[in-house]
Amino acid sequence: MFCVAPPESEAKMNITKGGLVLFSANSNSSCMELSKKIAERLGVEMGKVQVYQEPDRETRVQIQESVRGKDVFIIQTVSKDVNTTIMELLIMVYACKTSCAKSIIGVVPYFPYSKQCKMRKRGSIVSKLLASMMCKAGLTHLITMDLHQKEIQGFFNIPVDNLRASPFLLQYIQEEIPDYRNAVIVAKSPASAKRAQSFAERLRLGIAVIHGEAQDAESDLVDGRHSPPMVRSAAAIHPSLEIPMLIPKEKPPITVVGDVGGRIAIIVDDIIDDVDSFLAAAETLKERGAYKIFVMATHGLLSSDAPLLIEESAIDEVVVTNTIPHEIQKLQCPKIKTVDISMTLSEAIRRIHNGESMSYLFRNIGLDD
């Protein structure tokens, strides 16, 4: 695992006052690795708590130490059973609230249901619902990382610190890809062009954008909530009324805007889940002359058979952070590499607990980052 090693004198972060309790809300032990890293960096012990499933699949939380008047930080990483993960967090937050904790800060590196943050036909904005549930349960502050859409912050009526993993990914490129100067940053769809531009400008590299069949289905969102009346029926009711309709979309043939011939292609995105679009992008880049292909993202969901598909694809390496546990996927696919971001989360916890400014963690971050 690639990680930024702090100087020896800074191996343990300085907690200037007492009253900090650090809990992991996961009942799955494989999801606790990040919590242990954060506790080690802060130089504190993990709080004593039991989180388990009853025989009837109900979630039960038993806090086994006093939290009265303390700053409670609850770390929750998303497992495959995302709904159980959410219930574990909500029940633990509510348990701390009823136990008179001074403040309850959720540390949720990957915010679940973040891909459902827009209205799709007769669907719902689920991330807004989840934000309301967290606030209602008693959460007073949220620390997360690289929200799928920054507008999700507005769904909360509590402070939200949306940290960035890009400094760690940029450092990985500079230190682990020897000839990265001959690389080009690639957006696999126009929707991810801003993120690619941010990486390219910081690394002083060129940019390429894939447009066409390989672009995300999410870019084709339909925002209609009700079925519109047929134009003819509307005109029949009001003969003078002719409502103009949008022309149906048609994807153009796949195109790469930018030169990738004889270069390393680095595809950047925030989430890797369904890898079909990444595989199609990699094939296209190979056809256009790219000789090595990297994929970099903050959150490695890697659902279903994604690791096996990556292993058999033209992609040379997939780099993700440890916001989500993926040790099993790494066993299935040696191409998957991990970047440790526990340092940023630990520093955020330390600063919030000590009442220090968070601006240090947001240096040089622009509106498009």
Curated annotation (Swiss-Prot):
The modification Phosphoserine is found at residues 219, 227, 233. The modification N-acetylmethionine is found at residue 1. InterPro entries: Pribosyltran_N, PRibTrfase_dom, PRTase-like, Rib-P_diPkinase. Keywords: Acetylation, Nucleotide biosynthesis, Phosphoprotein. GO terms for cellular component: cytoplasm. SMART domains: Pribosyltran_N (SM01400). One of its GO terms (biological process) is purine nucleotide biosynthetic process. Pfam families: Pribosyl_synth, Pribosyltran_N. GO terms for molecular function: enzyme regulator activity; magnesium ion binding. It comes from the Eukaryota. PANTHER family: PHOSPHORIBOSYL PYROPHOSPHATE SYNTHASE-ASSOCIATED PROTEIN 2, RIBOSE-PHOSPHATE DIPHOSPHOKINASE FAMILY MEMBER. Belongs to the ribose-phosphate pyrophosphokinase family. Binds to PRPS1 and PRPS2. Seems to play a negative regulatory role in 5-phosphoribose 1-diphosphate synthesis. This is Phosphoribosyl pyrophosphate synthase-associated protein 2.
